[in-house]
Amino acid sequence: MQVEETSIEEIQTKIKRLNSKAGQMKMDLHDLAEGLPTDYTQLMDVAAATYEIYRQLDELKQELKKLENAK
């Protein structure tokens, strides 16, 4: 049971950090989009990085839900 608690806490900490990073990436992507066509060459890289952060966040949230339901 202690192992599960630690895992849940670790995942919650990772989610918190990723949420902060994801919010910043979302704002960066928004700012880049507002400035189009300037810096359009960066659009795919920023979008891909933003997608990856949100994919990781979704994966962690699903893992957390499984651990919490297993209790």
Swiss-Prot record:
Keywords: Nitrogen fixation. It comes from Nostoc sp. (strain PCC 7120 / SAG 25.82 / UTEX 2576). Belongs to the UPF0437 family. Pfam families: Rop-like. Signal peptide: none annotated. InterPro entries: Helix_hairpin_bin_sf, Put_N_fixation. This is UPF0437 protein asl1434. One of its GO terms (biological process) is nitrogen fixation.
